[in-house]
């Protein structure tokens, strides 16, 4: 029997494709909705390697406007135009500036197509923090995370079909993540570095040293950079893999 919620890791890598991994993208499926969390440049490869029709996506949630997290949206648009022939609406949720950034990128990559109206309705919804909304039975809550000062950057908490998922987005460590992930079913946490300590990303020692304080039912490290991949034999926490499917 199918689990109430399935999460497919479409991309578990960082901006540099470390280890040959794809950019950040996660698909959440339930009986009521199918949605994507982040949409990196390699999203179509991730979807098609997992034999997932891009047209199944009801809405997209973007954590912040770095290319490895939103750069795949124009490629989705192109797939919907020429491959899956989408006709139903698509909604994209994201921080302030999402519509302008997405459409500017679409224009830069596919000049002619960006000038014509898309044959399916696309709407952009800017979410604030704290921002809480319900979409197709999914409760979406955005919260601010400390990543880069020039952008509004979010983590997300989702309540879907009786399950709870927290996604850190890109962030430096903050103890707010301990409270945000209390008793959730799945916490997908970025882990970009190992020996390098940064204010804008989490290192493996930082998360490993706090793992005992986390009460989430499952912790999964993602957005993996070259350092944690090179030192994988020293890592005891679960690592995401491209194509991994998690049943909740």
Features from the language model and the residues they span:
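Binuclear metal-dependent hydrolase catalytic cores
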Residues: 1-166, 232-248
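Active-site flanking residues adjacent to catalytic metal/cofactor-binding acidic residues
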Residues: 37, 63, 169, 189, ...
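Short beta->alpha connector loops
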Residues: 41-42, 146-149, 171-174, 225-227
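Cap/insert and terminal regions of metallo-dependent hydrolase folds
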Residues: 172-248
